[in-house]
Each structure stands twice: as C-alpha cells, then as structure tokens.
Amino acid sequence: MANQRIAFTEWTPDLAGVAENLSVAKNVVPTALGYNPFPTAVNYSAAASENLNNVFAGKFSATTNIFAGGATKLFKLDGATLAMNNVSKTGNYSAIVKWNFAQFGNTIIAANNVNKLQSYTLGSSTLFDDLNVDAPVAKYVAVVRDFVVAANLDSGSNANKVQWSNINDETNWTVGATSQSDYQIISDGGNITGMTGGEIGLIFLDRAIVRMSYIGSPLFFQFDTISRNVGCVEGNSVVQYGSMTYFLGADGFYSCDGTNVTAIGTQKVDAWFYANANQSKLNLMSSTIDPIRKIVVWEFIDNFAQNTLLIYNWQVNKWSYCTTDVDVVASSASAGMTLEGLDLYGNMDTLTTSLDDALWTGGKFLFAGARDDRVVTFTGANSDAQITTGDIGGETTSVVTLARPIVDNGSGSVAIASRMLLNAVPQLGSYTAADSENRVSLRSSGNYHRLSVIPTGSNWSNAIGIDIDVTPQGAR
C-alpha cells in the first residue's frame, strides 16, 4: 500500500482529464496554494423601483456615494437608510439601457448610448442632468489624463468615433481654436466595443486595440494601433486595474498593459467558456476586480440560463468558476453603518456578515453587484464548493482504500470515480463525510481514479489537496 498526496493545482477544463490538473474547481477562489472559499452574496441596499444593471462607487472628500443604473432610472444609495433613491434626470429615461459610469473630479458621469452624457455633482446635485447641451450621446465613457472621453457615439451611428472634452473641463465639448476638445474616427478595426482610461486610454474595437496618448497641441491625442488581430467582442467584459486591462476576445480572454496583449485563457478556460456561455446573451455580461483577493471576475449566463462567474487570479495565473443568483458584478465601497443602522439588517443573531467585516466600515472596498432590484455584497457565508481532480494512475490497476481531505479549519466529504479505460465516462459515487479522524473509507478499483472533495465546516479557509491510500491490484 502506498500513500499519495494529490495537490489541488490548476483548474484547466480545456485540457484532457489525464492532465495533472483539476477537472472541477467550483465555488472557490484560486490561490497560490489550493483554493479559498467563495462567499455568497447578501443584500446591502433596500429595493430600488426597478432591477439594476450596474453599480458604481464615487467618492467626494471622505464620503462614499454608491450609484446604480436600471433600465430607465439612475439611483443613489442613502447611506443612512439604505434606500435606493431615484436621482434620474426629470422624467427618467425612456429607453431600456445599460449604464456605463466614470468619475471626473467631483462629477459622476453616466453613459447609456441613448441620451446625452448625464452628470451628477457630488455634494451639490440632487438629480442627474445632461452634462452639457454639446455633450455627445455615447455608449462608453472614461477619463484619460485631464479629459473626459466618450466612445461609440450617437446611438451607434458613429460607432468608431472617439470624442473628448476640453482639458480639465468636462462641460466643454466645443471643437475650436480656444479648446482642446476634439474627436477622432478610427477607420479600421470595426466598431468600438469598450474603453478604459488613466494616463493613457485604450480603445477596444471588434478587431483591434488602439492606444490613446496625450501629446499636446495641435493634435492633442495620438492614436496608435497596438493590435490588429485581437479585439474585444463585448464591452461589458472590459475591466481595468491599475495599468492592466482584461477583456474577452473572439477566441478567449486576454490582458493588455497598454503595449502588449497577452492571452491568459489559452489551453485553460477559453474553450470551456465558449462551450458553456450563451452566445446570444454575451451583451448581459458584467465584470469587475476584487483587488483584495487579486481576482478578475466575469459574470455571464450559461446555456442553462444559470448566472455563472469565471474567476481569474492574476498573481498566480489560476482560474475557477462559481454559480450565483447575482445578475451583475461590480466594485463598490461601503457607505458605513452605525450600530443603530444595523437594525436595518435585523438583530445581531440574524446578521450573515461578521461585525469585523469591511462591509460596516465606510469607504472600504467591497466586491459587490446587483441581484434583481438590490445592491448586494459578496460578504456572506461560504458557498457550497466542489473540487475534483483529473485522472490519477493509468499504469496498472489499483484500489483506492482511504482518503483524507486537506482542508484548513475544516474537513470534507469525498467521492470517487474509477474506470478501467479512458473511453469510459467517469461516474462519481456518493459523497461520504470524513470521520472524526478526518478519514474516508473507500474501496474503488480501476486504472484511472478521480477524487472529488466538498469542503465542510462553516469556517473552512483553504482546500489544499487530498491524501489517498492506494494498493496495486493485478488485472484478471
């Protein structure tokens, strides 16, 4: 009998099951050593008057302001009551749209591809209104250096056009000798499908990526194509953290640092994503960054109408996935909560989030989103996780007799699938919980074995691997 330790390495569904990687990494977060639990979503706000399709956190002085967009309205969270107040332009908005947000100074700017850019000045506005009579109608908005930049204009009539405001003046969109406001039409690459800002701007098109760099008068901005083959298929997949931007291309997931475009999903998750995602609903994707966990999260609808999260840890280049009932993922920040305000969530015994959590501290980053008509935060209990290995063995027939899950602050239930030939479909048996000595008795014979672990214990923190006892068996 031999003891063998199987580490929970990378999840690579695009590779054959005989690879020394995982076949399932569900409802977990990838780390350098194993996987951490993925938290469930809990309601943060009261109900808005319609379902939400984006969430954005703006900050003015020391005050965090949370905004959200619905099909026909814009909302602002009341930090004291958690009510979602309608702060739309008078009369609301007639079209069913998805919102894109940016902050320039103390002004929140929202784009919906139907109305002129909308603005809300933190500290003084009570409602959104047109940014300016000359402001464009845009699908995307970002801030590049000291300019507000709009892209894919006029409800798609100028889908390859970029326009920017005057320097340090988001209200001035007049092109002329006394203004640095201007525009650029990108002639090749297709329609603009996304944009990010910062020191430089990145313009994503169907079949290209263009870098937007400030060079001063008389041209103001220089536009350089950094990719003529790889573009972005869905703007809602574009998400930025620091100098890095992550996005979905026609053949998979990429990162871009402003100069280089790098494939991050090749031979890992690209084929899995396109096989599982509902292609007709990619426009309903959302994406965000969790800088604390160092992950990018893409939300999409799969072929069975299930909301699914695809998770990428950029520090260790590992992936996982989750199922969720959340419609939109977003980065947000807490508005802060007094002990009296906690009454809005029920009594101390019914709180699903620890009082030590950043949720209750104003201005702290929150991995958030929206579920129906409420803002939610991913600060709840651990999701029900499952981690399944690839095939182990293959040289001779063997019997797995014992398993010991390696789970920090917890244990696990174990199931096994054994088969003689690779053309047989692996079928997991029933899960058996580990006993008080963290042992699961098994007796499963085959040439190839897969072990599946469901981590248990409400406070389990890291699933590292599984130890098994294996006995060789002669073929008959």
What annotation goes with each model-predicted range?
Residues M1-T81, N92-N106, N229-M244, A250-R476:
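Beta-sheet repeat architectures centered on beta-propellers
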Residues G70, N112, N152, L205, ...:
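Short beta-strand/turn micro-motifs composed of small residues
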Residues T40-L52, N85-A95, S125-L284:
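Beta-propeller and closely related beta-pinwheel folds
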Residues K73-G79, L117-L122, S155-G176, R211-M212, ...:
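Short beta-strand segments and strand-loop junctions that repeat across beta-rich extracellular domains
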Residues N21-V29, I109, A159-N168, I200, ...:
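Short low-complexity stretches enriched in small and charged residues
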Residues A68, A110, S119-Y120, I203, ...:
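Short beta-strand element of the conserved SAM-dependent methyltransferase core
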Residues K98-V133:
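Hydrophobic or amphipathic alpha-helical targeting/insertion segments
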